[in-house]
Curated annotation (Swiss-Prot):
<dbReference type="GO" id="GO:0009423">
    <property type="term" value="P:chorismate biosynthetic process"/>
</dbReference>
<comment type="pathway">
    <text>Metabolic intermediate biosynthesis; chorismate biosynthesis; chorismate from D-erythrose 4-phosphate and phosphoenolpyruvate: step 6/7.</text>
</comment>
<feature type="binding site">
    <location>
        <position position="22"/>
    </location>
    <ligand>
        <name>phosphoenolpyruvate</name>
    </ligand>
</feature>
<dbReference type="InterPro" id="IPR013792">
    <property type="entry name" value="RNA3'P_cycl/enolpyr_Trfase_a/b"/>
</dbReference>
<feature type="binding site">
    <location>
        <position position="346"/>
    </location>
    <ligand>
        <name>phosphoenolpyruvate</name>
    </ligand>
</feature>
<feature type="binding site">
    <location>
        <position position="95"/>
    </location>
    <ligand>
        <name>phosphoenolpyruvate</name>
    </ligand>
</feature>
<dbReference type="InterPro" id="IPR036968">
    <property type="entry name" value="Enolpyruvate_Tfrase_sf"/>
</dbReference>
<feature type="binding site">
    <location>
        <position position="23"/>
    </location>
    <ligand>
        <name>3-phosphoshikimate</name>
    </ligand>
</feature>
<keyword id="KW-0028">Amino-acid biosynthesis</keyword>
<feature type="binding site">
    <location>
        <position position="22"/>
    </location>
    <ligand>
        <name>3-phosphoshikimate</name>
    </ligand>
</feature>
<dbReference type="GO" id="GO:0005737">
    <property type="term" value="C:cytoplasm"/>
</dbReference>
<keyword id="KW-0057">Aromatic amino acid biosynthesis</keyword>
<dbReference type="InterPro" id="IPR001986">
    <property type="entry name" value="Enolpyruvate_Tfrase_dom"/>
</dbReference>
<feature type="binding site">
    <location>
        <position position="169"/>
    </location>
    <ligand>
        <name>phosphoenolpyruvate</name>
    </ligand>
</feature>
<feature type="binding site">
    <location>
        <position position="387"/>
    </location>
    <ligand>
        <name>phosphoenolpyruvate</name>
    </ligand>
</feature>
<dbReference type="GO" id="GO:0003866">
    <property type="term" value="F:3-phosphoshikimate 1-carboxyvinyltransferase activity"/>
</dbReference>
<dbReference type="Pfam" id="PF00275">
    <property type="entry name" value="EPSP_synthase"/>
</dbReference>
Amino acid sequence: MLNFISKPVGCLKGEITVPGDKSISHRSIIFGAIAIGTSVIDGFLDGEDCIATLKAFQSMGVRIEGPDKQRVIIHGVGKYGLKQPQNIIDCVNSGTSMRLLAGLLAAQQFDSQLTGDESLLKRPMLRISRPLSQMGADVTTQDGKPPIVIKGGKKLNGIHYVMPEASAQVKSCLLLAGMYAEGQTKITENAVSRDHTERMLRTFSYPVQIQDGAIVIDRNGECHGTRLNIPGDISSAAFFIVAASITPGSDVLIRNVGINPTRTGIIHILTEMGADIRVLNQRAYGEEPVADLHIRYSQLKGIDIPASMVPLAIDEFPVIFIAAACAQGKTTLHGAKELRLKESDRIGAMVDGLNQLGVHAEGFDDGILIEGGSIQGGEVNSRGDHRIAMSFAIAGAVASAPVTIKNCANVATSFPSFVTTANMLHFQIEEYS
């Protein structure tokens, strides 16, 4: 078992980049694989989750070179060129791989099956199997959870689907199925979710319409190979945005970070708490906005986090809770029940961990209350969740004594170079087994 020890530090200073965006990396493989022609992807995240997606397409006959220095070259086979995999597709720990692949595979002429690790096998899949079945797909789960068994050769029909809650994975799953369905597939969102799929469709020259809060797609299009630069992942930058904000004397610059407006909830929340975050040198990598982020220490104050921020910061809440633990006053969050359905129950894991470190935290069914103050040393269990592990590693920098974090191997799913990058800013994080 891989564990971390994170020791208290003085201040954090320096300039870093973070690995490529995980959401965009997954999608670059998917659309590159079903494109006509070759795609060259730079900035690809070679973490375990995205490698699971890459290997899935290799098993379906797509030739993919790399990753080599974050470059991947994909030799697309076109929309109808995928071949039946010889084995069950293992999505390992990646819910994105499983949910997006399910939409694509539901439209193929061959049978397939998707499985994953112990954590993934606990995650809810009815949210995709039900609308796919409405489209005419034959998709079965085990009591609403993986593995997913898909019978190919089914004729899909477009539907108008009103999203019951914000979920980029469900939306993307249905858009991928809609690329093969008879008639239009229309998806209406009542709350904003990540729009990387819609942007990626445009990057690969596939027609998609956005009208009155709905996304419309049909099968009358093809993806075409392209060149793509992937920006740094704001979900990975989040750990260092918070770290610099809560560690006195800190001054950190993070270059080339994606600032897609459906992902910048952490900047809005921390700014409301009093953080000193400057967004510099704004530009674009294709369809995705990018900037450099300059963060300096500032005393934070507790706030009531608006529920409207939940889909815009869903993956960043564990480390936002660390910021709240260092803020003056109380921080509350409601409307975030989805956090209990991630790689772990992130509300439960953070409440337990914060209490272990002397911070008063209470969990609700859909949120949390944290009384800010000081973080003590101690030991916490990440529950095998990469974002919990990295969040408590950040806490160690400002704790009164070292923080030991158990069960950290899954950090490799999203940020394999986390410890190296952190220590460049003068963290003192050690790994041990």
